[in-house]
Regions:
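Positively charged, low-complexity/disordered segments
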Residues: 139-141
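Catalytic/RNA-binding core of pseudouridine synthases
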Residues: 1-133, 137
Length: 141
């Protein structure tokens, strides 16, 4: 493999690692193995620390291909816990509400899950890693 010229690699990101942790550790080990001070390494999409799954990592000139991978169709598999909420919508923050779930049937859950199939336009929550550019127009004087 020619990591300096560019390679596309697939990693299974471990639980509790950030995407940055994975890239940083790989970059460190790779630069030591190749005996170079600096090597270009990037990833094609962030996974939350509490998510595990495939991360596409590119090296060298292959980092120019990141956009090709970043916006491809993705599949998510989730385990959920009904009846509890957190401010971050995941387990990174403490549970802030507990609600009864006895009335919820399997059929209702399966019906709701169908709304998550296909192309979905999402509004990222406040705790999202999504970068948003804010523009404020000058106010008239």
């Amino acid at each position: 493999m020619d990591f300096i010229a560019g390679e596309v690699l697939y990693f299974n990101k471990p639980l509790k690692w950030t995407s940055f942790d994975l890239v940083n550790k790989f970059r460190y080990k790779l630069s030591r193995k190749l005996k170079v001070k600096k090597i270009k390494v990037g990833h094609a999409g962030t996974l939350d620390p509490l998510a595990t799954g495939v991360m596409i990592v590119c090296t060298g000139k292959a980092t120019k291909r990141i956009d090709e991978f970043q916006y491809q169709t993705k599949e998510y598999v989730a385990t959920l816990k009904l009846g509890e909420t957190t401010p971050s919508f995941d387990l990174e923050k403490e549970i802030d509400g507990v609600y009864p779930t006895e009335h919820i049937t399997r059929e209702e859950v399966e019906k709701v899950l169908q709304s998550f199939v296909g192309t979905i336009q999402q509004i990222p929550p406040v705790f999202s890693a999504c970068n948003c550019l804010l523009y404020t127009s000058p106010s008239p004087r």
